[in-house]
Regions:
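Domain-terminus/edge residues, biased toward the C-terminal soluble/receptor-binding domains
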Residues: 157-161, 169-386
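Bacterial N-terminal signal peptides
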Residues: 9-20
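N-terminal secretory signal peptides that target proteins for export/translocation
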Residues: 1-5
Length: 386
């Protein structure tokens, strides 16, 4: 699996959407969490952030990276839910009942199916299960951590480093609120066949029943995942996703003082995100949003369109909102193919980016004749590219 970013350079195409502006000030939000982000799932845009890129101890939320590696191996048929892994002495001592942490209570040298280990990690946050998966898949936790870091890099997590599968404290293990939101978005988008496990209310194994540690799943506010975490040093944290009104949000909060504060702050943030924004239809499917210059093309420019309708989520009652810029890496060079992603629409409210929508070439543009190429070359030489 290879996931690549799309580098863009700013171009001065400013779109005026002032007719949609409201008359009041956008609702402010604050949280007791030390670190927090609220991400729009569709666009990946942060609707709220507090220390989003500051390194923090991820605690058991690091298990989401473990789960991502397992999901990836399952999807690529390199691993089966029916495979069985041993519970090693390391898994038993570090993550078993005697460790005092979250555990599935697996016995030393027993064999457990991947399906049970995976559910234990997701629902119960079992440390022994996470270690057993890591050792069974990679031979050792350090080797598995290398797989975690490789995948993290591929999906665009730029501020994280993992050294174990459990999230147990280590000075060299860290992540950021933004990275954990990126990870949650990847899990939801890439693995729909497995994502429903996060919403399972409980898991029973070997006659031991344990409830989902993510209490928000049972709150009736649309939360269907993902993971909680806690250590004495880092405090209480959570990564949650909720879907309401046809829109999915991802929230990450960390550094709170108690389980009850964690649940309440997460509830407040996702509720604010659900109720504090409104949908504004802007461009129907196929409507040209802007034009991009094509250097040496048969046509001097190409129209940029979205895929489907472009609707904006903006804070209710915001002033100076929305305005937008179109950015693309240009000038483009032919041939340009219809449907090729070439830019993005960046929407601002009160000078804060609230939505990013990919834009695609509306038509093909072939290479122009020698006269067109010479003309564009002269223009670039004398004037720079406008």
């Amino acid at each position: 699996m290879h996931v690549r970013g799309f580098g863009l350079s700013l171009v001065g195409l400013l779109l005026s959407l002032a007719l949609l502006a409201g008359a009041a000030t956008a609702q402010e939000f604050d949280t007791k969490a030390k670190f927090a982000v609220l991400m729009d799932y569709e666009s990946g845009t942060l609707l709220f952030s507090k220390e989003p890129d500051t390194a923090m101890e991820p605690a058991s939320m690091a298990k989401l990276m473990t789960v991502a590696v397992v999901f990836d191996e399952l999807q690529r048929k390199k691993l089966s839910m029916d495979d069985e892994f041993f519970i090693s002495e390391h898994a038993w001592k570090e993550g078993g009942a005697s460790s005092g942490g979250s555990t599935m209570f697996a016995e030393l040298n027993s064999k457990v199916k991947v399906s049970d280990l995976l559910r234990s990690v997701i629902v119960q946050s079992g440390n022994d299960a996470a270690i057993a998966l890591a050792e069974g898949m990679a031979g050792s936790e350090p080797t598995f951590a290398g797989m975690m870091n490789q995948l993290a890099t591929e999906i665009g997590m730029t501020g994280s480093n993992f050294v174990n599968s459990t999230g147990l404290p280590d000075p060299n293990q860290y992540s950021t609120a933004r990275d954990l939101a990126v990870l949650a978005r990847f899990l939801i988008a890439q693995f729909p066949e497995y994502y429903s496990i996060f919403a399972e209310p409980e898991f029973t194994w070997n006659k031991i029943r344990q409830e989902n540690r993510n209490s928000l799943v049972e709150m009736g506010i649309g939360v269907d995942g993902l993971k909680t975490g806690h250590t004495e040093a880092a405090g209480y944290g959570t990564v949650v996703s909720t879907k309401a009104g046809g829109r999915r949000l991802i929230a990450v909060l960390h550094g709170m003082k108690s389980m009850s504060e964690r649940a309440e702050e997460a509830r407040k943030l996702v509720t604010w995100g659900t109720r504090g924004f409104e949908l504004i239809p802007v461009y129907p499917d196929g409507k040209v949003v802007a034009f991009a210059n094509v250097y040496g093309g048969k046509e001097p420019e190409v129209g940029l369109v979205g895929k489907g309708n472009i609707d904006l989520f903006v804070p209710k009652g915001a002033t100076n909102c929305p305005t937008a810029t179109v950015t693309y890496k240009g000038p483009l060079r032919p041939p340009v193919k219809a449907g090729q992603q070439v830019g993005q629409l960046n929407v601002f409210c009160n000078d804060v980016v609230v939505q990013v929508t990919p834009l695609y070439a509306a038509t093909d543009v072939e290479q122009g004749d020698i006269v067109r190429q010479a003309s564009d070359a002269l223009k670039q030489l004398l004037l720079g590219w406008l």
